[in-house]
Amino acid sequence: MLNVGFIGFGSRASGFWKRNLAPFGLCTVKAIADPRLEEIKAVWGEELPDCTWYTNAEEMMEKEKLDGVFVGTRCNLHTKYALLVAKYDVPLFLEKPVSITDEEIAQLESIPHMDKKTVVSFPLRVAQLVTVVKDIIDRGVIGEVAQVQAYNNVNYARVYYHGWYRDTDITGGLFLQKSTHDLDYINYVLGRTGPKTVCAMESKLVFKGDKPAGLKCVDCPEYLTCSESPYNIEKYDTKRVIANAKCCYATDTGNHDSATVLMQYDDGLCVTYTQNFIARKGAGKRGARFIGYKGTVEFDFNSKTVTYYDHMSDRVDNISIQSTGSHSGGDLKLAQNFIDVMTGKDVSHSPLSQGILSAKMCLAARKSAQTHTFVEL
């Protein structure tokens, strides 16, 4: 049985354990370090009887003999704890983004020995939809890729304006929160080491306003009439209600509500990626179109489809991928890969170097949007 330690055991880490790691029956939660110790023990204590509990990650790493560590803290602590785990040379599952500043990226680049034993949480790159698209492209079916058009219309985006994700000091902003996934799978499908130039623009046209900073929805005089209050959201979108929601029209919401990134690779290939956080319900889409001289292949995570268009005939192939599980089944594949890394059977399929590359691209996009300049990588 593999002994896994968790640094941070919030909804993402605990959910990943229960839905993806635990079902294999090969791991046990040996230790958890989280400052919310008593709160977490109250929920998980009975289910994890063999777990040793800590409030301090350094103490956990010093005292426990672990086969692997899952870092599931908030984003501004990912690098700090990756460096801690690296001191013990233990396989690491690291949540994205791996870093939110250039300084943190430099720190991660100082631990190259962790590259192939770190599984970065990039489940989209290993989702079956992406695997099918990559296979089509690698076989030369569409010819050399001449353009990529990628998109993400996030229909569950209230969390980025009502909850803690609105604090960009913690998250680094929505390029690092959302784009990091998509830019990674684009690099992976293309088999590229990243673009040479990045530029981006962002806008904030909806979730802005002059309400007081820190205002909670329940304390607002417009609670019963505001279409974004939990009171009204509950009527038509019950899965998207945020507990203790803060006003998304306050002065401290942070985060753009739409943005577009343009990237150019060494050979001149141009890639566009656009994201918005205004679309709702059926308007949600996430995927990309890869265009070559001989054909086009596109996919969409929401509809679970891959479509191939032959440019030389009227042929159109539609492939339905009925993947189940979070992130289109990618989380389960990452969990299996992490187990294989811990047992020495395989190396990471989403190594630290790719997490660093994606973070660099996102930071370049953020800098470009803020300075209205092209940024060289």
Where do the model's predicted regions map?
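Active-site loop of classical SDR/Rossmann-like NAD(P)-dependent oxidoreductases
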Residues: R12, P35-E39, K281, T324-Q336, ...
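C-terminal helix-rich "cap/oligomerization" subdomain common to oxidoreductases
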Residues: G68-F70, D266-D267, E298, S303-T305, ...
